[in-house]
Amino acid sequence: MAIKVLVVDDSSFFRRRVSEIVNQDPELEVIATASNGAEAVKMAAELNPQVITMDIEMPVMDGITAVREIMAKCPTPILMFSSLTHDGAKATLDALDAGALDFLPKRFEDIATNKDDAILLLQQRVKALGRRRIFRPVVRPTTPTPPPRSSASSVLGGVSTHTQPAPVRSSHAASIRPSGKQYKLLLIGTSTGGPVALQKILTQFPANYPHPILLIQHMPAAFTPAFANRLNGLCKIEVKEAANGDVLRPGCAYLAPGGMQMMVERTGVTGRVKVLAGSAEMNYKPCVDITFASASKAFGGDVLAVVLTGMGADGREGARMLKSAGATIWAQDEASCVVYGMPQAVASAGIATQSISLDNMAESILKESARG
């Protein structure tokens, strides 16, 4: 049975094109369209769609208000469309706070010109959210879409992909006994669902968290400054968008800039961030694999790396390199993920040693990071 989709936008052109693109996929079906947030709230309750695509700026009722009302009355996975501006980034983050699960940049030219990658991306995101199981009391079984092959392995130097899988323990924070390792760096990589997950985790960290933190979130260049500023205002630790040459400091989180690659190099007892344009052949900018791989070379086993919710398999090959160097790798568990793609890739390959719920992740990291 096709995933039922409600398309919400005040532009008749955009409603029509999004509907056409969604309906091109046999696994998807647009059941209705709405021209403002008020109509969306009404249709969501009446039609029970499995996914809603939502514009932000609309008459009568804006998209953020509509998200709040829908999540209060009939929780439904919502994909936001956002303009690539500072105000658009802020509004999108507000929508995610209100309960939306994911977003896509609103590029009229890509939609209008039938650009293949834009079409595929929209279809993939809608299907991923349509498989989100937490929202519905009755769930139809689905088969997860195999994560797309990353081009990172060639860039990272031909890492072997034949690690024998080992069982992954699903753990509660109380059940995790600190390993006693003395870490020098915390890495967190994520994609779909990441902004909310990162906020939940990092707001629980104390100001004196003992290690530098590198954050890799798939996000456009226009969004990462606003996201870093938001986290910095909410967290006790410092959060900043990473800049080339930043010296790593304990209790500071460095967010990889959108459209760039973030690497780390060792400089004496600490490290330094390198921000590069990177290869055009990479699927993701920023790419979790790139940051993880550089950390394996710079810090070896002195790293705790966590892979959170996200679509695809970015992070798997970099995590494999980290594990080979002696680092500790954790993954978010399936039940608490918006999309169980990136964590599944790490867990099913036998790279992650723990599978931890989002609710328990911060406490688990703090216990493991505590200096003896």
UniProtKB/Swiss-Prot annotation:
Residues 179-372 form the CheB-type methylesterase domain. Belongs to the CheB family. InterPro entries: CheB-like, CheB_C, CheY-like_superfamily, Sig_transdc_resp-reg_Me-estase, Sig_transdc_resp-reg_receiver. Its EC number is 3.1.1.61, 3.5.1.44. It comes from Shewanella sp. (strain MR-4). This is Protein-glutamate methylesterase/protein-glutamine glutaminase 1. Its main location: cytoplasm. GO terms for cellular component: cytoplasm. Contains a C-terminal catalytic domain, and an N-terminal region which modulates catalytic activity. Residues 4-121 form the Response regulatory domain.
